[in-house]
Amino acid sequence: MMKNVLVIGSTGQIGSELTMKIRREIPGSTVVAGYIPGAEPKGILLETRPAELADVRNAPQLAAIVEKYQIDTIYNLAALLSAVAEKKPLLAWDIQMNGLLNILEVAREKKCAVFTPSSIGSFGPETPHVGTPQDTIQRPRSMYGVTKVATELLSDYYFHKYGVDTRSVRFPGLISNVTLPGGGTTDYAVEVYYSAVKGEEFVCPIAPGTYMDMMYMPDALHAAVQLMEADPTRLVHRNSFNIASMSFEPEQLFAKIREYIPGLKVRYEVDPVRQAIANSWPDSMDDSCARAEWDWKPTYDLDSMTVDMIECLRKKLL
């Protein structure tokens, strides 16, 4: 059972919601919101404290936080997303690999569990695209994907070599009604809801017919907590589990939104960088191992997610 938790990247797309979820749902827990300069916590994230500067590239800083709060679990959410990582590959490597190594070393010394998410971006064009198996060829062609595969391998290494309790999932594209997109290939599936609710034309950077696995943020947060609370004796895999919820292409998403907002207008301006990344990713993943080993099961499908997204964004924007 998690008690003292450090969330690194607490103000990002996943971290901002995950930090508050753990604070609400695990009685007596201390959840430290780790952040970097320029991405300070605000609002309820700050009000519910504690918060600490936590740069993954600063190992002594991380060790001091773990010692100060007697951290038992680290959520490492520091990363550049796929499209941004292609523009800044060296920075992506520094944050995602050198940063991870710092975290794993601190975890080894201080006996912490570590969750570092992987992604559908860890797969490449040689991967079976439909029903992508848990264990299969990966070979990504983006810097983001390369770092994710290396993350999986390094995390497994620290488990087998040093006994560090490392666990992770391969997140699909994540759709949130709370945080804005941050430079990912699947961001279009968030942005279109904002355009629809505001009555604006949406310019889609991904070509019609491009299927990708997606997931509503509440399911992703549940997975991140559920896996870290799971019985370790059941875990055959650790880094990283396929988890799936829904798979769709742009026209299917737009048609679903038009069931509730008929006036949605869309035109395509395909971004070749994002499209190339999307083409190399799976259309759908087989998550049977997660279901068997820790009882993973999503709650939302495309329709229920769309209803909730529109309702929440109307309250937020109008």
Kindly give the residue locations of the regions a language model identified:
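C-terminal substrate-binding subdomain of Rossmann-fold SDR/epimerase-dehydratase oxidoreductases
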Residues: 205-207, 213-318
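N-terminal Rossmann NAD(P)H-binding glycine-rich loop of SDR-like oxidoreductase domains
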Residues: 5-25
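NAD(P)H-binding glycine-rich loop region in Rossmannoid oxidoreductase-like domains
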Residues: 56-95
